[in-house]
């Protein structure tokens, strides 16, 4: 995990130093998250949030790298008798996305994401329990997405994060994150490149 994070950060720093241009920005959006359970019933979806910053690094006219630093609410919901329980996981995520940019502001993106668990709570009937010890402290996923940015720097994006690693630290059953997100972002731009 540390090696992967080092490679992602070092690559981003190198690209920033050699890039055609770098635009920083902020973003926020909604997550629809669930947990995939190996050989069991998957968790139902739950709504949460994501928010943070980005650096859009133009490498060529049509290719960019975009590292981000995001606070992200994840987890899932489940039935307990007639009640609904929630697993609320809070991560600090660092995606590093390769983007192909069409000339009209549209983008396709994909890349790895490393996440660090900041907190984990289980909530049923207004009773909240800390369950952070039941989950691993880090997560690796792969992101797929698309977006659009205007000449003014305001944009929208959608993304799906497919968890690749087992986050369950309490038993031998594999549990993986699944997150669909949609949001808005603003890039501080020079109005010449998208």
Predicted segments, located by residue:
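Transmembrane beta-strands of outer-membrane beta-barrel pores
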Residues: 30-34, 49, 71-75, 114-118, ...
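Outer-membrane beta-barrel translocator domains and adjoining extracellular loop/strand segments
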Residues: 36-42, 77-84, 120-128, 168-173
């Amino acid at each position: 995990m540390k090696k992967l994070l080092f490679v992602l950060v070092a690559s981003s720093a190198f690209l920033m130093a050699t890039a055609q241009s770098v635009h920083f920005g902020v973003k926020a959006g909604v997550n629809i998250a669930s947990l995939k359970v190996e050989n069991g019933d998957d968790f139902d979806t739950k709504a949460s949030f994501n928010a943070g910053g980005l650096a859009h690094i133009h490498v060529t006219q049509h290719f960019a790298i975009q590292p981000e630093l995001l606070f992200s609410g994840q987890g899932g919901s489940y039935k307990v008798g007639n009640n609904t329980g929630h697993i609320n996981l809070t991560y600090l995520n660092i995606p590093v996305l390769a983007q192909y940019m069409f000339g009209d502001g549209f983008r396709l993106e994909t890349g790895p994401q490393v996440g660090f668990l900041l907190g984990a709570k289980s909530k049923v009937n207004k009773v909240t329990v800390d369950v952070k010890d039941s989950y691993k402290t880090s997560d690796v996923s792969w992101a797929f997405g698309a977006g659009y940015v205007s000449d003014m720097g305001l944009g929208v994006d959608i993304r799906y994060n497919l968890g690749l690693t087992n986050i369950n630290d309490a038993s031998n059953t594999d549990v993986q994150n699944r997150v669909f997100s949609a949001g808005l972002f603003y890039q501080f731009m020079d109005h010449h490149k998208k």
